[in-house]
């Protein structure tokens, strides 16, 4: 699949249910995290998509610019532009399906999806946030780090080495200039499900709880022992079972 955004191509995939006409069962858009791809951490989105399509849902996921097989460079990403990319995804998918869609997002993608949903609330039937990484603001603006690594090299050479991939100064400067990821999410008042592991080593569980308190339609669940990428079969089964239950409720099924 291909979607245009500001001269670049977002590439992704779509799974269709075998026994239900397109759009009849509902639609789910997955949004990946920082430095990840459309399949999610360790194929989390693919695993979930299989269960969702078996239940009659259509599932779509894209690589954002600078990620996966999409155009662009990771060095050029910014949260603001990634929010606009998610808005573009939501508009395209809801137009194709002729109905609002469910948005499910992980980590920084969850932060950006909450902001995007507030811009197009009528197109988002529900929002599910897994391990929302609101910590990105405190990490950069307060602690001068990204995932525990110091940002001093950015000032010296203009880029941050993120696991072998260069992240540009623009991403850091945008946050330091006062980006408020919470204020920009408040405009979405639809149903929200926030799940966060108590042993998340990247984003402390308090950040998930904050989204649960901030968004008027939100419920918050702390999953005992779960890490940032939900790296056990029981944790992932819990995520998918909960997602199926909520989507059915909100789709009137």
Where are these regions (language model features)?
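N-terminal cap/lid segment of alpha/beta-hydrolase-fold proteins
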Residues: 1-26
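The alpha/beta-hydrolase serine catalytic core
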Residues: 5, 10, 116-118, 122-253
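Short, surface-exposed "cap/lid" segments of acyl-processing enzymes
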Residues: 18-63
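Short beta-to-alpha linker loops that shape the active-site pocket of alpha/beta-hydrolase fold enzymes
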Residues: 34, 58, 63-68, 73, ...
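Conserved catalytic-core motifs of eukaryotic protein kinase domains, centered on the activation segment
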Residues: 40-42, 70-74, 205-206
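Catalytic nucleophile-loop/oxyanion-hole region of alpha/beta-hydrolase
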Residues: 67-98
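Short beta-strand immediately N-terminal to the catalytic nucleophile in serine-hydrolase-like folds
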Residues: 103-105, 130
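Gly/Ala-rich beta-loop-alpha elbow adjacent to hydrolase catalytic centers
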Residues: 105-113
């Amino acid at each position: 699949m291909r979607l245009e955004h500001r001269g670049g191509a977002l590439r992704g995939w779509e799974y269709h249910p075998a026994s239900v006409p397109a759009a009849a069962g509902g639609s789910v858009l997955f949004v990946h995290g920082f430095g990840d791809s459309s399949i999610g951490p360790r194929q989390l989105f693919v695993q979930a998509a299989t269960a969702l399509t078996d239940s009659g849902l259509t599932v779509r996921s894209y690589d954002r610019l600078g990620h996966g097989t999409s155009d662009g460079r990771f060095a050029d990403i910014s949260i603001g532009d990634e929010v606009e990319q998610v808005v573009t995804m939501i508009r395209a998918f809801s137009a194709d399906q002729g109905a609002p869609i469910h948005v499910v997002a992980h980590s920084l993608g969850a932060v950006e999806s909450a902001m995007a949903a507030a811009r197009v609330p009528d197109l988002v039937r529900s929002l599910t946030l897994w391990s929302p990484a609101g910590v990105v603001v405190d990490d950069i603006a307060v602690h001068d780090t990204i995932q525990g690594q110091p940002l001093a090299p950015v000032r010296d050479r203009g880029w941050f080495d993120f696991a072998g991939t260069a992240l540009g100064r623009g991403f850091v400067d945008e946050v330091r200039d006062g980006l408020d990821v919470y204020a920009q999410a408040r405009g979405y008042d639809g149903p929200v499900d926030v799940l966060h592991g108590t042993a998340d080593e990247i984003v402390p569980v308090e950040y998930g709880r904050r989204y649960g308190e901030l968004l008027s339609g939100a419920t918050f669940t702390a999953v005992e022992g779960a890490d940032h990428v939900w790296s056990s079969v029981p944790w992932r089964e819990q995520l998918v079972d909960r997602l199926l239950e909520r989507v059915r409720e909100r789709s009137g099924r």
